[in-house]
Amino acid sequence: MFNKMRKTKEKDVPVTKEEVLRHPMPNHVAIIMDGNGRWAKKRALPRAAGHYEGMQVVRKITRFANELGIQILSLYAFSTENWKRPKSEVDYLMKLPEQFLTTFLPELVAENVKVQVIGHTEALPDHTRRAVEKAVKETSGNTGLVLNFALNYGSRAEIAAAVKQIAKDVERGMLAPEDITEPLISSYLMTSGLADPDLLIRTSGEIRLSNFMLWQLAYTELWFTDVLWPDFTEQHFLEAIAAYQRRDRRFGGVSAR
């Protein structure tokens, strides 16, 4: 089972951009960007070096996803659990959104990319939050790729907050219990207005979801690779999409093939 979700080596010939464009593309690709620390450790470098290289890959994959016509690219950038890391590492991670968005924002604006953020941004340092808010504001009118960053995000907390708000709305008489449906619950989540991911990519060889979009990933195709995030390339992205295109998505029903 897990082998079917992992990166496969069925073809000796690399997948090409032209090949994947001949088939239906996933509208929403989500990525758990894992392995920055291990990448740095293998090279006897500080963990910050891995995070810096990982940021360069974010640029590269964002550009490529836009070229391919992907509609939404969701990136798990910082989880609610990541605060447990050493303070020096957390401080550096909090600088990365500012560095990334300051240098990359003009290109995002020019390329019609819309920046969105999910997560508890109120808990971010002021300088990080200001950079994020500026990017969201300056790209709010863009209509191309939605670049959705999960910052200080945890799916269980997201679901709990949605349930609390629904309970309050029932108590106030704004909702009746029979009004509570799956689409309604989705509308109370941070991802309200975004389609659920079609494809989830996780790098670094780990096979778990790490509290990321647990509700939204119900019928998402999963693709795992041993490649560490700083080593992830456009070719790996194409391989993930090609694997997705070979899947038979049944959504709990029977195969149409």
UniProtKB/Swiss-Prot annotation:
<dbReference type="GO" id="GO:0000287">
    <property type="term" value="F:magnesium ion binding"/>
</dbReference>
<feature type="binding site">
    <location>
        <begin position="208"/>
        <end position="210"/>
    </location>
    <ligand>
        <name>substrate</name>
    </ligand>
</feature>
<keyword id="KW-0460">Magnesium</keyword>
<feature type="binding site">
    <location>
        <position position="51"/>
    </location>
    <ligand>
        <name>substrate</name>
    </ligand>
</feature>
<feature type="binding site">
    <location>
        <position position="39"/>
    </location>
    <ligand>
        <name>substrate</name>
    </ligand>
</feature>
<feature type="binding site">
    <location>
        <position position="83"/>
    </location>
    <ligand>
        <name>substrate</name>
    </ligand>
</feature>
<dbReference type="InterPro" id="IPR018520">
    <property type="entry name" value="UPP_synth-like_CS"/>
</dbReference>
<feature type="binding site">
    <location>
        <position position="85"/>
    </location>
    <ligand>
        <name>substrate</name>
    </ligand>
</feature>
<feature type="binding site">
    <location>
        <position position="202"/>
    </location>
    <ligand>
        <name>substrate</name>
    </ligand>
</feature>
<comment type="similarity">
    <text>Belongs to the UPP synthase family.</text>
</comment>
<feature type="binding site">
    <location>
        <position position="221"/>
    </location>
    <ligand>
        <name>Mg(2+)</name>
    </ligand>
</feature>
<protein>
    <recommendedName>
        <fullName>Isoprenyl transferase</fullName>
        <ecNumber>2.5.1.-</ecNumber>
    </recommendedName>
</protein>
<feature type="binding site">
    <location>
        <begin position="35"/>
        <end position="38"/>
    </location>
    <ligand>
        <name>substrate</name>
    </ligand>
</feature>
<feature type="active site" description="Proton acceptor">
    <location>
        <position position="82"/>
    </location>
</feature>
<dbReference type="GO" id="GO:0008834">
    <property type="term" value="F:ditrans,polycis-undecaprenyl-diphosphate synthase [(2E,6E)-farnesyl-diphosphate specific] activity"/>
</dbReference>
<feature type="binding site">
    <location>
        <position position="47"/>
    </location>
    <ligand>
        <name>substrate</name>
    </ligand>
</feature>
<dbReference type="GO" id="GO:0005829">
    <property type="term" value="C:cytosol"/>
</dbReference>
<dbReference type="InterPro" id="IPR036424">
    <property type="entry name" value="UPP_synth-like_sf"/>
</dbReference>
<feature type="active site">
    <location>
        <position position="34"/>
    </location>
</feature>
<dbReference type="InterPro" id="IPR001441">
    <property type="entry name" value="UPP_synth-like"/>
</dbReference>
<keyword id="KW-0808">Transferase</keyword>
<dbReference type="GO" id="GO:0030145">
    <property type="term" value="F:manganese ion binding"/>
</dbReference>
<dbReference type="Pfam" id="PF01255">
    <property type="entry name" value="Prenyltransf"/>
</dbReference>
<keyword id="KW-0479">Metal-binding</keyword>
<comment type="function">
    <text>Catalyzes the condensation of isopentenyl diphosphate (IPP) with allylic pyrophosphates generating different type of terpenoids.</text>
</comment>
<feature type="binding site">
    <location>
        <begin position="79"/>
        <end position="81"/>
    </location>
    <ligand>
        <name>substrate</name>
    </ligand>
</feature>
<feature type="binding site">
    <location>
        <position position="34"/>
    </location>
    <ligand>
        <name>Mg(2+)</name>
    </ligand>
</feature>
<dbReference type="GO" id="GO:0016094">
    <property type="term" value="P:polyprenol biosynthetic process"/>
</dbReference>
<comment type="subunit">
    <text>Homodimer.</text>
</comment>
